[in-house]
Amino acid sequence: MSAISPKIQNQIAMLQQVQQQMQTIMSQKTQYEMEIRENRRAEEELNDVPQESAVFMNVGTVMMQKPKEKVIASLQEKAESLELRVKSLEKQEKMMQAKFEQLQAQVKEALEGGNRPPNAA
């Protein structure tokens, strides 16, 4: 069996790099989706709390009492921001998937072409 050409080795390395980037994007997306669910759950719980109840919110490393409406608004704003990030990551994921499939096809074609004897047509 012949050695793999430097061009194919480079394509394989690029394929692995794209795969790692896709995994990173999917991991971030999963993390953001989990944060969105947590925010929505907290918002639902706050809606069930009586208006006069004390509500606290983390501000940096300190917990401060805030009006219920402000805490709910803050949760909604954060969830919306996270949803935008998720959409952005989904676009990146689609682009990476297309790039991955293209590189994969190129590598497969190069490997099959390199192992095939020339056809006399």
From Swiss-Prot:
The record's GO molecular-function terms, alphabetically, read:
protein folding chaperone; unfolded protein binding
Q: Which UniProt keywords apply?
A: Chaperone, Cytoplasm
Q: Does Chaperone appear among the keywords?
A: yes
> Between which residues do disulfide bridges form?
none
Where found? Cytoplasm
Q: Which GO terms describe its cellular component?
A: cytoplasm; prefoldin complex
Q: What does this protein do?
A: Molecular chaperone capable of stabilizing a range of proteins. Seems to fulfill an ATP-independent, HSP70-like function in archaeal de novo protein folding.
The entry's family comment says:
Belongs to the prefoldin subunit beta family.
Q: What is this protein called?
A: Prefoldin subunit beta
